[in-house]
């Protein structure tokens, strides 16, 4: 049985799906740990080519003592999915007074289903409440209170 590799560090990055490059922030984050940025970028782009190009994808890179690495893709941030669903560039600067968009219950459910694997919520309803809170803090009006 092979010996387990010793983990040196874990690096959290957010990269555009299918469009990552060794330029900052990827190269400077991986370089000090001896990880080949072009090799990571190629593997990342291969694994994210089925996703919508440019969609921000969080990734956790685990670096081992022999300078090898592995990485885990996470689901896109809730704010990114909300902005995409509403068709807006950014949230409101004053979320209480200024509403910038409206999120339907169907859109809320769809986003919650996408995010559920990476959330601490145990049920879809709990995930919908979390996503609704994020939307409200962005100045997006949620169709129905949960």
UniProtKB/Swiss-Prot annotation:
CDD domains: Ribosomal_L11. One or more lysine residues are methylated. One of its GO terms (cellular component) is cytosolic large ribosomal subunit. One of its GO terms (biological process) is translation. Pfam families: Ribosomal_L11 (PF00298), Ribosomal_L11_N (PF03946). InterPro entries: Ribosomal_uL11, Ribosomal_uL11_bac-typ, Ribosomal_uL11_C, Ribosomal_uL11_C_sf, Ribosomal_uL11_CS, Ribosomal_uL11_N, Ribosomal_uL11_N_sf. One of its GO terms (molecular function) is structural constituent of ribosome. Keywords: Methylation, Ribonucleoprotein, Ribosomal protein, RNA-binding, rRNA-binding. Signal peptide: none annotated. Belongs to the universal ribosomal protein uL11 family. Part of the ribosomal stalk of the 50S ribosomal subunit. Interacts with L10 and the large rRNA to form the base of the stalk. L10 forms an elongated spine to which L12 dimers bind in a sequential fashion forming a multimeric L10(L12)X complex. NCBIfam families: L11_bact. Forms part of the ribosomal stalk which helps the ribosome interact with GTP-bound translation factors. This is Large ribosomal subunit protein uL11.
């Amino acid at each position: 049985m092979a010996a387990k590799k010793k983990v040196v560090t874990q690096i959290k990055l957010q990269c555009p799906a299918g469009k990552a490059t060794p330029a900052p922030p990827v190269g400077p984050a991986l370089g000090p740990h001896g990880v080949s940025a072009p090799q990571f970028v190629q593997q990342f782009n291969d694994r994210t080519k089925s996703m919508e190009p440019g969609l921000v994808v969080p990734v956790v890179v685990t670096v081992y003592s022999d300078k090898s690495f592995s990485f885990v893709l996470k689901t896109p941030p809730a704010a990114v999915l909300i902005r995409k669903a509403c068709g807006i560039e950014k949230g409101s600067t004053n979320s209480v007074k200024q509403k910038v968009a409206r999120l339907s219950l169907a859109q809320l459910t769809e986003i919650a289903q996408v995010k559920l694997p990476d959330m601490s919520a145990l049920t879809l309803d709990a995930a919908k409440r979390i996503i609704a809170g994020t939307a409200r803090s962005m100045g997006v009006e949620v169709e129905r209170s949960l």
